């Protein structure tokens, strides 16, 4: 065999060895099936944790899917189709109140504000909530926290939902933006980056933040079935470590830097739109500094649910939210 042939053979063997090593390494990672409620820049710390390899550092590989609704995400978790469900705790409360034995438990929090911004099709020179009186808002699903927060904010500003203003609630989350852009409604409450895209096309203007108006609350949380959480706490501990690394990374980097990292999760969105969206969420303190769920914020969520008529009585924090794992993650950093 010629010297050149030997070199080619050695290179080929080296490539195969690297591929086999990578495959073996991947096989050593424990797969976590994660269902997120929607795809939004609002969940930037999660995407950073995936993109920067923080889960791999914990021996985990995330199989990420998007449910497009808290109800759908909760159903997937209950059925065992996923290991972790990322959605609003309102779904957990509803399931518990239906008498489920192996109910869902939240173990780590990612967001503590409503992620919706409020857009006007034809904005006044200066926005006031009085402007919406007699108009039509493209809202969200009845019973979901985005819709309940919108109603809360309207009431706090003297506007009675469905009486002083029409609210469209029958559209699927992913269809609402297209309907508004096609001419439906005078206003819309929606997550980023959808509204910044509309604004860039000159078809509306962001005039307010529902999250800033509604105040801090337990908004989007990682959940597991109670039995699974108790059976394998180490899995969820490692998962929470990775999420907290994502939180810390986002806190210590600019909107531009974060946007570049999460861009692969939004292949159809221009980078400048992602940067703007990140800046909007940073401006309202959308993310808590730790994954520990706040009892006071959970109570505020239930206050909003009670006001919306979606809850008859408050559920004790300790029943549905478990802070021990997130608290342990913080202890490890001391």
Question: Where does each model-flagged region fall?
Answer:
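Short polybasic/polar patches that bind polyanions
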Residues: 50-51, 56, 155, 199-200, ...
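Short, glycine-/small- and polar/acidic-enriched structural segments
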Residues: 27-162, 166-172, 179, 186-192, ...
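Predominant activation on well-ordered alpha-helical scaffold segments within soluble catalytic domains
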Residues: 47, 93, 151, 196, ...
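Conserved C-terminal helix/tail region of periplasmic/extracytoplasmic solute-binding proteins
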Residues: 302-334
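Short, low-complexity disordered leader/linker segments with a strong preference
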Residues: 1-31, 331-334
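Secondary-structure end/capping motifs
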Residues: 230-312
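Soluble non-cytosolic domains of exported or imported proteins
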Residues: 40, 67-71, 86, 144-145, ...
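Pocket-lining segment of extracytoplasmic ligand-binding domains
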Residues: 91, 122, 173-267
